[in-house]
Each structure stands twice: as structure tokens, then as C-alpha cells.
Amino acid sequence: MTDQIRTLQGRVVSDKMDKSITVAIERKVKHPMLGKIIVRTTKLHVHDENNECKTGDLVEIRECRPLSKTKCWTLVSVVEKA
């Protein structure tokens, strides 16, 4: 069994915290009865060591060990500046 490190891309929606950002991850799912494709959003708290992200940036994040009660993701890179 190989352990794969989960990486996701999302948009920064808040950078008000020190060394932390909130990232919104959008995914498309099919409604079970209607069959319509709908967009679901998940908000994650991400560790940003150097406070380099601003609201609106597109970022790549990686899962890591729990850093606090709500943070278990860390910033890999800024894909696109806002």
C-alpha cells in the first residue's frame, strides 16, 4: 500500500489570521435524484508560514499532520496571484 500525499487547489477567501489562511475548495458532484451537476464548496484552514498569500490568490495545498484543532493542511505554492 502506498501513502499518497493529498494535494488540492483552491482560492484564498480570508487572510486575516497570523500564519493562517482560509481556502475554499470547489468540487462538482452529481445530484443523486435529479442528475444535475452542482458545485459544492469546502472551506479549509491552511498553514501559511510566511504570510505570503492574499485574498483571491489561487493556491496549492498539501495535507499534513494536525497543526491545531482545525488546521491540518499546509501551503505548497501560490499558483496565481490575485
Swiss-Prot record:
One of its GO terms (biological process) is translation. It comes from the Bacteria. GO terms for molecular function: rRNA binding; structural constituent of ribosome. It comes from Tolumonas auensis (strain DSM 9187 / NBRC 110442 / TA 4). This is Small ribosomal subunit protein uS17. One of the primary rRNA binding proteins, it binds specifically to the 5'-end of 16S ribosomal RNA. The keyword Cell cycle does not apply. Pfam families: Ribosomal_S17. Part of the 30S ribosomal subunit. GO terms for cellular component: cytosolic small ribosomal subunit. Belongs to the universal ribosomal protein uS17 family. The keyword Ribonucleoprotein applies. The gene is rpsQ. Keywords: Ribonucleoprotein, Ribosomal protein, RNA-binding, rRNA-binding. Signal peptide: none annotated.
